[in-house]
Amino acid sequence: STRVRSSAASDVYKRQVAVGGKTAMEKSKKALLEGIKGSDIEIIDFVWYGGDSSYENVEKIKNNPSVQKADMVFGIGGGRAVDTAKTYCALYNKPLFTFPTIASNCASCTSLSVMYNPDGTFKEYSYHKAPAIHTFINTKIIAESPEKLMWAGIGDALSKEYEVIFACREKNMIHTPLLGKAIASASTEPLISFGKKALEDCKNNVPTEAIEQVALDIIITAGLVSNFTVHENNPNPEEDYYYNSSLAHCVYYGASLFPQCERQHLHGEIVSFGVLCLLTYDGQFEERNRIFEFNRSIGLPCTLGEIALTPDDVPAIAHKAASVVEWKYVPGNPTEDAFINAILATDKAGKEFLADK
């Protein structure tokens, strides 16, 4: 349910503004109004976030009169909508509550935002001091969301365990990231156990145990891992660490350079192919074969061609990968050539796997 009854929300903050996606706010408006009924909270406006998580849209939100009047913000929708609201609240010191309307990523529960340039290409991570005060998940709304978005969310969350455990290797682990690593180990199995059924139930718009388990995995488990495995903008840079993602997301950031991929394929869809590339790079071939099977079972990609890329695109992907923060924490001595070879080998193995089915 979406019941806002905490002292944090009603006793201190009275005027609330909703910032989010147009469809997301339309779908959740009734539940939100029902949720605040009987409290002192007033929703003074519903403000569109601008269509992408960019600093330009954050500035537009800042200049909105309703946002300026509000005591707090409800961030509503998918990852880019929530990341925009989150960045605004972090920069301008507004309390934030999040309401994910799709189970496509963990943005609602994390203390960082993925920011993009106005042309849609990846710009940077924006790090915040804390996540939202509270995240509300309404499984009925999630069940009525597009099945394809949950599908992509499964692909994104599929990366969590493999990337975190890989990135933590050869590191001097202290308590907080060690705890994040432990939580990450609980990420993969719920997706494999409940993922296919959850997609079927989402297609039929039926809130079920499978949808609840997958939504919790995508939004909460992955979000908690992120919060425990990232420490950036520290006064002592030598104490910084970033173990939250690794080579699977490196594939995504490189792929975002290619419009035919970035515009036609979802974040988690691309990341799921990146998981296979990471497992190839790390020599985990038995586990890679298990994920080949899982990806095929729900239609996630096993080859470059399925995400509108070719072998000729791979050097540019690897070059971009070497420029992002994840590359710094790849264990061993990573090289662009080694990553190129891993991606190409994954594509070759994926083609052979699909040909045998």
Identify the role of each PLM range.
Residues K27-F97, K197-I211:
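N-terminal small/polar loop signature for handling phosphorylated ligands or for N-terminal nucleophile
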Residues Q284-K357:
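C-terminal charged capping/lid subdomain of soluble metabolic enzymes
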